[in-house]
Amino acid sequence: MRTHFCGELNKDNIGQTVEIYGWVNRRRDHGGVIFLDMRDKHGIAQVVINPDNADFSLAETVRNEFVLKITGTIIARGEGLTNPKLSTGKIEIKAQNIEILNTSKPVPFQIDATDTSEEVRLRYRYLDLRSDTMQNRLRLRSRVTRYMREFMDEHDFLDIETPFLTKATPEGARDYLVPSRTHSGKFFALPQSPQLFKQLLMMSGFERYYQIVKCFRDEDLRADRQPEFTQLDVETSFMSENEIMTMMEKMTRGLFKLVINVDLGDNFPTITYADSMAKYGLDRPDMRISMQIVSIDKIMQGVDFKVFSGPANYDDSRVAALKVPNGASISRKNIDKYTKYVSIYGAKGLAYIKLNKNGPASPILKFLGDEVIAKVIEMTDAKTGDIIFFGADKSKIVNEALGNLREQLAKDLDLFDTQWAPIWVVDFPMFEVGDDGSLNTTHHPFTAPSVDAKTLEKTATTALSKAYDLVINGSEVGGGSIRIHQIDMQKTVLKLLGISDQEIQDKFGFFLNALEYGCPPHGGMAFGLDRLMMIMTGANSIRDVVAFPKTQTAACLLTDTPTSISRKLLRELSVKINLPEKD
């Protein structure tokens, strides 16, 4: 029977006989004595096996990652032999009995190696998860979800499960579809979120709901996205935006303090979407970076340089400047690198002015004139030694290009403040206008606008929504809104999205019917647990905080999925595969 965990042993246990279980983290032979570093979920303890031990010959066969049961006596390590890197570094276990519970093939990589490729780590994920890093991250994740549940319970929220097999609805990404065997030719969809069901729970009178739930989105993957992801989903009736934000802020503040001992401060600041885009180029501003984007349209409207004057005179375009402190030392080679970087976001170039000791220097000086240059320097508060980058194009392109350049420069030049920086982003546009003039919701079709239905029909392109996002260190960790609770408004929004009456009835009929039976005002929020964990642990990717993640191509290297399905099963599901022809 196990008496202690490896990592819990210390000087207080000296003289005690203990029984431990675990894996061989490392095996060493020194002067005829065998040393084993035994690892379990709490840490590592050193075991020493002397040649006179009856199990010495057995110990000689032991290799890394063998699973052992060891009985022995705790003794103090000799002078000069302690290991300050281990919590157990002042003691060791003098083995009495050794039992091999299981052997191990030679492992394809050292468990705690930092140079192992991600492909190998994911293919042998069960080995990768044995590392201290992954063990600690997943334990932290467990503490986070435990705190969330406790907070929700303390505030009278009910944990209610919602269906995974549900109806396909347009929520901004492609659905994962599940064919129905019993209803030939028909499909379920895996939920992109529990959105409609949690609203139905509010209509059912539960008032406060939460769930830590898996969601599924078939979309292009990035470093911070997975096809299946986990979120804390929250919905509540009879609360305003500010009341919901205050409660969720309280939970976030307590979570960071308890789990990683970070004080996020009281009263998170708030910024409007419009200000965030104007000053930071993105709707998830990283407030650890002091650099701001400055609009310079007015002073560029009359210049002869059409690259600037053109966008400066159009309503949907802008000319903006980004000052980089001490950036004049950036080499031409790196400026070319940044020019290529902003082209990813549609920018056609990256103009700049360096403020050297001898004055401004730039290929564009001759097009602007001294007065305009002086005004730009004044508006950006630039000093000798700085560099000013420019963006001039459609507002969307300029915002994305300079917003992402701002973050990249901060990484390259180490311009981050060390303090954590939470901020609420509010007053989002209700709709985004597509290139073809069609409307798309900025969040989802169930977000309440800040105006009534009649006004919304007239001002759809400028109307704001009652939505809010929580951003920490430039990452959106949560988002929510007040929901539409009146059927006329819901129909108006769906029609503005170009959805026909028949499609509205087919896809949302059940939901619209429920709105007619005394739906309370309600709202909510969802926290992306995976992204939150990435921020709290400092991981580079969500794949590093999920036990069994998918790759960037939505594949699982461990189980070699997705896989083909037998023809027999396809026939049972009434599914026919029609693959596109290869070029």
From Swiss-Prot:
Keywords: Aminoacyl-tRNA synthetase, ATP-binding, Cytoplasm, Ligase, Nucleotide-binding, Protein biosynthesis. The record marks H30, G80 as: Important for tRNA non-discrimination. Its main location: cytoplasm. ATP binds at R217, D218, E219, Q226, E476, G528, L529, D530, R531. Transmembrane segments: none annotated. GO terms for molecular function: aspartate-tRNA ligase activity; aspartate-tRNA(Asn) ligase activity; ATP binding; nucleic acid binding. One of its GO terms (biological process) is aspartyl-tRNA aminoacylation. One of its GO terms (cellular component) is cytoplasm. This is Aspartate--tRNA(Asp/Asn) ligase.
